[in-house]
Amino acid sequence: MNSRRLGGLTAAALLSVGMSLGAGLAAADPGDYTVLLIDPNVVTGSLAYTAPPPVLNPGGQPGAMTIYTHRDGRTIADTVWVLGDPGAAAGAISSAQAATPVANSKTVSVPVGQNGQLVTGKSPDGTRSLSVLYFTEGNAAASLEFTGPAGDPVPQDLVVEFGQKQDALIKSQLGT
């Protein structure tokens, strides 16, 4: 499996989080969940981000995931899982948080979706800043991972704005 680095994580690690959710996740109706991913170019009003085609059903779980790369090297990994019920969504977030290594981490509640949590710190090797936003919305679970230079983390207000737009997109597409 390709193990492209995402700050403290790899794409393979993100996919394995999805796989580890396993039997606790009921299958949602099949569909093109890539419409649930928010494009950072829309949020920032720029064309500075590029992304490969999204991965449908990452780790075999219903949902979508992609990695946006800014021309300056910053990345945003956007993952949305669509699960059987809100309890499964909350469980997915717990599993994702447990699988995300953030050094010198600080966690704060943020006004995004249901139970929005922002974890900030550095990649385990200390070379990148890392901010990961987790939230649920109905039966959907979302993880947004922002990486950048170690001394220049993404501003919290931008993470919250991005998360709120991601939440609004989930609501509009899933009717939650």
Task: Label each PLM-derived region with a short phrase.
Residues 37-58, 87-133, 168-176:
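Short Gly/Thr-rich strand-loop-strand
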Residues 65-93:
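A short acidic-to-branched-hydrophobic micro-motif
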Residues 77-78, 139-148:
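Short, well-ordered beta-strand elements
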Residues 6-7, 17-35:
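C-terminal region of N-terminal signal peptides and the immediate post-cleavage residues
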Residues 1-13:
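N-terminal export and membrane-targeting signals
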